[in-house]
Amino acid sequence: MGISVGDLLSMDFFKDFHVIAGHKGLNREIQGVSFLEVPEGHRWSIGKELIFTSGYIFAEFEGYLDKFCENFIPSHAALVIKRGSYLDKIPEKLIEIYDRNSIPLITMPYSPSWMTVVNQVNVGVLNHAI
């Protein structure tokens, strides 16, 4: 058993994380963490992950956004994009697909390290499971 996206986001550490789409899916379960930074990265998803990205995959690989949306597999808990990294603006197509599938699309501050964020997710998942 994991923790819901909504419960995780209610933890103080996540106060500057903002849900921009998929609000109806805040009850989705998180059991772990994954990253999406390379074109084949979506193949490694096994479900119920909170997927993090800097946005590099969408900014630097021409056509990947379309491919991602066409092959969208709604098994992950949510997607978190680091603000101010590679995307000036979250693509409208991404917002639409997350809203349509009721999967939270979340933005996070630029400053926290991946290790710090992953540790906080793990704390939330483990504390909720105990």
Spans of features found by a protein language model:
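Alpha-helical/coil-rich non-catalytic "connector" segments in signaling and regulatory proteins
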Residues: 1-130
